[in-house]
């Protein structure tokens, strides 16, 4: 091809014309797309408020199957941002995924604290609010223990709650939960270090921690993407209605952050982040030590390989601290938010999570079905729900071989022999009725079906 000295200029001119035409096309649809962004709907799965306390609302989602699992799931989200990230859009909704798998699903919507709430601490959120919600869900389901699924800060609080109230939790699921903060490689660990940051000064200034303060901090962890790249990508995809709608839903969620109660913020930053007290098993809430060894029921950890907020090493070491011998970790190539909204996570991760809860919940025994759990004093202790052959062998070593022996023994002796918590012993006692209970003994009563873990 002969050399054309004008080719470069002609190519540049052609590219300019194409770019102008492209810009004109995008400009023509911009008003329509802007309207979509402004009116986009989120959190569309039908639910009713079944319990309220202060600002808190407990949501119960409408079932999507004819039959539901006997053991309900209570979803505990973080105290920051709105929980509808778990129900962002119908085809990428964790809530719907659980419902479609036959689970009975509840979720706590914390809503925004007022200035009057700035003195609420972790004790209030864990031992009052979460505990009251667990009791409400359990009562509505006619059960004595339920499943928990905690996300982010909600996962941390769920772990704390479970350690304090193990008898009320059948199985514990944790998503991107901050549980261990020592050399995790996470930016937040460095930024939240007591060497550089004092949460008390923030709270002394604001009372409650403003949502804008938190949002800007998270955005600055990846400033190029959060302040520039994503808007360029939006512009390049204005012609795609689906892309714009997905973008709008996420932006709405990011824009609707909520303030965080001041005292809870200080306690969380100082105790969990800076002092790593939960992982070191030295945390105290409400004057009671949070012994993570009490977490002896099935535990599931869902972690994102590329989670820049809660890296895998801020979650996985916790598995070695709990008292459970049934611990499962699902680590997936996604980020902190991607695990709840990405199409690949919904395809690869959530079916496994649904199955995990199903397999560890069983068909269950309701609290009013006493006739199914009536035993003679001479019955082998292994027949008690939750004991099984492993614990029965341990108990036999100290002479506890029958239902009558179990009734006569004190909780401390049983717990030490079996290698479980006294809370778990209380579960065993509640799970049966001895038809010939001796005078002065401690009869049990029927309860939920507890796994032998």
Model-flagged regions — what are they?
Residues 36, 43-114:
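Short, surface-exposed "cap/lid" segments of acyl-processing enzymes
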Residues 311-320:
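Short alpha-helix in the alpha/beta-hydrolase fold that links the catalytic acid
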Residues 1-16, 139, 159-263:
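Alpha/beta-hydrolase-fold enzymes
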Residues 120-140:
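Alpha/beta-hydrolase active-site loop
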């Amino acid at each position: 091809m002969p050399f054309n000295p004008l080719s470069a200029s002609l190519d540049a001119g052609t590219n300019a014309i194409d770019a102008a035409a492209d810009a004109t096309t995008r400009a023509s649809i911009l008003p329509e797309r802007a309207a979509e962004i402004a009116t986009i709907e989120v959190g569309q799965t039908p639910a009713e408020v079944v319990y309220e306390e202060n600002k808190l609302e407990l949501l119960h989602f409408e079932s999507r199957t004819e039959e539901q699992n006997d053991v309900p799931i209570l979803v505990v989200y973080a105290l920051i941002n709105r929980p509808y990230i778990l129900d962002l859009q119908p085809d990428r909704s964790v809530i719907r995924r659980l419902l479609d798998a036959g689970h009975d699903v509840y979720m706590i919507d914390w809503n925004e604290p007022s200035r009057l709430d700035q003195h609420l601490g972790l004790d209030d959120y864990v031992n009052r609010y979460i505990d009251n919600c667990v009791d409400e869900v359990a009562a509505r389901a006619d059960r004595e223990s339920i499943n928990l699924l905690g996300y982010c800060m909600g996962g941390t609080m769920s772990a704390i709650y479970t350690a304090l109230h193990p008898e009320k939790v059948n199985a514990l699921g944790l998503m991107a939960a901050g549980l261990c903060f020592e050399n995790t490689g996470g930016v937040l660990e460095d930024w939240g270090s007591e060497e550089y940051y004092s949460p008390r000064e923030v709270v002394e200034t604001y009372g409650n921690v403003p949502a804008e303060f938190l949002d800007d901090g998270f955005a600055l962890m990846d400033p190029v993407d959060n302040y520039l790249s994503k808007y360029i990508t939006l512009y390049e995809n204005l012609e795609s209605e689906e892309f714009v709608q997905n973008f709008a839903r996420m932006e709405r969620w990011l824009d609707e952050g909520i303030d965080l109660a001041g005292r809870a913020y200080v306690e969380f930053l100082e105790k969990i982040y800076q002092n790593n007290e939960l992982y070191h098993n030295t945390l105290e809430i409400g004057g009671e030590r949070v012994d993570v060894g009490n977490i002896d029921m099935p535990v599931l950890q869902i972690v994102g390989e590329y989670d820049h907020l809660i890296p895998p090493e801020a979650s996985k070491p916790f598995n070695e601290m709990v008292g459970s011998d049934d611990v499962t970790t699902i680590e997936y190539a996604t980020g902190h938010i991607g695990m709840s909204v990405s199409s690949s996570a919904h395809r690869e991760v959530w079916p496994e999570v649904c199955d995990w809860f199903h397999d560890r919940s069983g068909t269950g025994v309701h609290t009013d079905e006493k006739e199914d759990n009536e035993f003679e004093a001479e019955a082998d202790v292994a027949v008690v729900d939750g004991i099984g052959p492993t614990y029965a062998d341990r108990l036999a070593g100290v002479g506890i071989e029958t239902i009558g022996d179990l009734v006569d023994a004190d909780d401390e002796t049983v717990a030490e022999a079996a290698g479980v918590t006294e809370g778990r012993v209380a579960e065993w006692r509640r799970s049966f009725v001895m038809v010939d209970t001796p005078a002065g003994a401690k009869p049990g009563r029927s309860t939920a079906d507890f796994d032998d873990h």
